[in-house]
Amino acid sequence: MSETAFERGNRLAAANQHEQAIAAFSECLRRNAQDWQALFNRGTAQMRLKHYPLALEDYLAAAALNPSSSNIKCNLAVLLKELGELALAENLLLEVLQAEPEHVDAWSNLGVVLQYALRYDDAVICHQNALQLAGASAGRLNNLGNALTCALRLDEAVNAYQQGMALQADDAFLGFNLSVALLLQGRYREAWPLYEQRWGTIMQPRYRERPWQGQDLGQQRLLIWAEQGLGDTLQMVRFLPELQRRHPEARLILACQHACLRLFAQLPNIELVPLEDTPPPHDWQLPLMSLPLRLDVTLATLSDQPYLQADPALASAWDARLPARQRGRLRIGIVWETGSWGVGIADHGRQNKSVPLTEFMPLLEDMDADFVSLQLGELPATLQDKVFAPEIGDFADTAAIISQLDLVISVDTSVVHLAGALGKPVWVLMRAESAPFFMAQGETSPWYASMHIWRQANPGDWPPLIASVAKTLRQLPRD
């Protein structure tokens, strides 16, 4: 019997050949435009390719033809989540669960939606319900571990991830997520090997050939390349001097973002190249964030002392451009939001890290201070008469400006790592679930002696924290 177009579409979709699957399902729909299953399956293939508007069109059409289908509603909810429509997704999944209280996928998807909505304990309950109904699986335990990690219920999170790995030891998502929970606990020696599993998740290594495993380099050439964010680059270059100490004859090449090149020129005996350029010949390569593993970094061996300096001439030039120093007033650098990460749920992390400007504003009111914006982009109109916005070219400029300030107050972004690396007092406005290298609790950082961490008491609730910061700021001595 010959294969039907619908069967061919399903086979191709199962093989992750989604473009071809879409063509097959479209063939079905040319024959019967009312085929809700073909619409549903084509929508799913469109979603796999992140063709979200087309997926939405297909799912809505399928739902109109079969309004009682829980599977259509579940997938539509997942799509709405990807579009950032969390309330709509939640309501749709609750509708499914009201009709089918034992719908496992609805419980799992609701848990993910509630996690993005910052309702971490509620998300945990959803994932526990899914596990109770369907039993343990790597995916369900990973979901549970993620919600527990966000809730900072870290011992429980570690247990969930470890249970998942007992079922599927090669699951990179479980291994990497376990490393994050361990990092939050300061269990670095256990975390670093698992952190290497990031390359089996959505992250893709820039280079794969000849990875350095920590062996003696002699006079060989090692390419170290930046990965992930600018803050990660600024944080991890601290380990290059120790690498040089252990391999004094090796030639070290650092491929980093353009914004870091001028600042990193101060690193002795390091050849710098732009990250996007073809690297010079090398014998081995290593992603920058694998250095802690190769150097066996623990809390006991981690130094919190400054390791970068601002260029004196550049600092002097910027000092002349900043608001003139006045007795009794502080110069304070501020960052209230990070740059856009994308659209829909892709921007969730940025939104969660950032303080809405209306909630940040009380920090600027009635304060004997001159505020300097350290974030890129045009200054909002509401800040024009409150904040000085220098035209910053790169991190050499930012470092020079920071060196002329009394304090930096910033959300979790690259600026806090730069301020800490310079030894400048920096107050970090930290979201409730924290971040891997900021520990789960405490006001100090093992990475930066000059850092004070202000932590949200409840997810998404910035006003009480901003009020506390403002109160403390007013009490600081002014010379």
Predicted regions, residues:
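Alpha-helical solenoid repeat scaffolds of the TPR/TPR-like class and their adjacent stem/linker regions
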Residues: 1-407, 412-479
